[in-house]
Amino acid sequence: WDADSPGGKLTIRNCRVESTDELTGRTDGIRVGSNSELVIENSEIKLPHFRSIRVGGNGSIAVRDSDLRTYGIFMDETAQSPNDAKTLKRLEITNSTVLTGDIIGARGGYSSVEEVVIHDSSIRLNDEYTYNYCTIGGGTNGSFGSIDIQNSQIHIPSSGGNTAIGNGWQVYYNRESRIRIANSEVSVRCASLGPAIGAA
């Protein structure tokens, strides 16, 4: 499903979505454009290999009371310099189960996320994609504002060179960031010399 027009809102509520697309290298499963809002509530969504849930720059995503199997949930924007950088305004996952193969947050060069909220949810990295650079937070050379994880289970056994919870590879921005993890079970690992939680 593709609605790549800016400033829109897509709501998926009380639905069961299972894609039967052939396996490809594309990463579009459900997509909305820049400055758009994507809301998934009380739904079950299963997307095949490399199919993801995406928003454009300066968008937001909310997942509530849902069960998702997807390649990732992210803003996918790559900039050539910090001057052109894009930001995911807010990502909320509440009372949901997510099996992911890639980023939860911002994906791409200089891409950042302002706020991530994960409450009463389970997020696991799919065993098929343990080679991926999976991060909850900002993208390559990007940053994050705040990450709040409460009453949840997070399992990311390998994040490649990325930080599992925080920013992606090689943070560029110098900014104040906050991570709060409360009443949760977190199992994460980073394959490089950087931290598993925080800023690489």
State where each predicted segment sits.
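Surface-exposed loop/turn motifs in large extracellular/passenger domains
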Residues: 1-21, 29-49, 54-200
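Beta-rich catalytic cores
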Residues: 26
